[in-house]
């Protein structure tokens, strides 16, 4: 039991350190890059593995073991998707409201699933940094992890709805609800 508490505390500290690493990077650069995401993930996971180079990554239902989603497998393809995402994130002339855009960014990042591990935490930090970068929050303190973890079944259902049926509306409403609930709790 004590080891589990220590491990949980270590994970929280790593998450906090990753947020501040990313925050410092975007304040210095004025934008979010693939390199920023690699630094965040490396801080979370204490490794330098970087972008996935080997195929075989699948997202599985933790109860049934059934494959829910297979992200891109080829490193070059992953890097191309990340470059497109980076361009989308940093294009402020597209006319998309930043709150809507953060929902789309989250979906795209999780779909790319560029790392061997730490994608969920990195994606949630990306949300926070995007909101800071666009002056929607002053400090990186809006943690969607609790909301997403509490509603994980709905999260994956809506994630698949976008992928299979291009239903972004329910996904966007879900993420916005999470932002609203989390904002009130913060």
Region spans (language model):
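FIC/Doc superfamily catalytic core
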Residues: 1-186
